[in-house]
Structure formats: structure tokens, C-alpha cells
Amino acid sequence: MIKKIIFSLFLILIYTNPILAMSDCEKTKHFKEWNDCKGEMNLANGEFYSGEWKNGQRHGQGKFNYSDGSVYTGQFKGGKPYGKGQMKYADGGEYNGDFKFGIREGSGVMIWNHGGKYQGEWLNDVVHGKGIATWPDGRKYEGEYVEQKKHGKGTFVWPDGDKYSGNWVNNKFHGFGTYTHAQGHIYVGNFLAGKKHGKGTYTYVDGKVEKGIWEYDKLINP
């Protein structure tokens, strides 16, 4: 009875895990002839691949060791990382998430060797879309990015407790937003390139209010 159970579990494992069910590639054949099999290939530059093949290309589950020391483990399509995977970079950084044609695209988590972390959307191998970024010193940004820059709606919190929530353009406060100081002072209004600019109201923690037109952080028309 026990043997039957073990055998049944073995069959389930085989048929639910394609890479286990797949036969080994014929080493007597050139890799370009490998199809629906699993095999290993060493390249002249020191790179190494172990995994599934289809129509002479890396396709399916596999592991690729790059010449610079980086290692990718995950899905391949047409010879390149495509789908879900993990890239461990030679410098100590690590990315887990979606790939397309060998680059980061879709959703993923990147942890840099300096301790910074980003979780969110990627496009063309760069941060793009909605996401959350944190830094080792306690800074945090949650919002929209365009080509790695904070751009759109977002909230940034500093280690000292200051907080900005509103519009961003090219990494700077731009448009309508709210800046709250750790001491309790609050500015609500318009910004231009990181400065209070346009209509806005600054309320101090003691109740004092400055309201009017601002120009590059200065109130010019109360």
C-alpha cells in the first residue's frame, strides 16, 4: 500500500513538473537541434546555461550564469529571460519579478546592494509606473514614476518626519500639494520645481496663517 502511494506521488511530481518530465537533450547533437529537452551549455566567454530547450533555444525553466558573475534563475522564451524570474547581480543586488526579452518589465522587487528597495512596476528595464521605494536612512516614496523619476501623484516621507503629498514633475514638487513639517507647520497649495509658488496657505503650529501668492518660497501677495 505504501509503495503504491509513493509511486502515485512520484507520477504526480513527474507530470506536474515539466522540467522533471522532460528528457535530457542528446549531447551528440548540436544545441540548435535540441527541442523539448533539458540540457547544459558552456559558452566560450565562461557563461553557462542549464535548463529547458525548445527549437534550439533556451525556453522554459532554466538557470543562466553570466560572465560578470550575475545569475538568472527562472523562465526563458526565445533564448532570453521572459516571464517570472530572479536575477542576482554580481554587485550584490537582487531582482525578483517579471522579465520580457531579457529585461525587467512588468511587476517586480529590486533590492540594491546599498540597501535601497523598490517594489512596483517596470518598463524597458527601469522603474516606471506605480511603486514604493525605501532607503536605508528611512526615506520612503509611494506613488508614480516615469522613467525612474518621481512624476505624477506621490507621497514622500523623510526620516525627520517631514512629509510631502501631491504632484511631482521630474523628481520635484510641482503642481498642487501638501507639505507637512515634523514640527506641525503645514503648507497647502501650489509648487513649482520644488518651491512654494502660486496660491497657497501656510499654517504654523501656533495657529498663525500666511495665505496668498507665493513666489519661489516667499509670500509676495498676502
What role is predicted for each listed range?
Residues 1-2:
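N-terminal secretory signal peptides that target proteins for export/translocation
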Residues 15-222:
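Glycine/tyrosine- and acidic-biased, solvent-exposed loop/turn segments at the edges of beta-strands
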Residues 5-14:
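Sec-dependent N-terminal signal peptides
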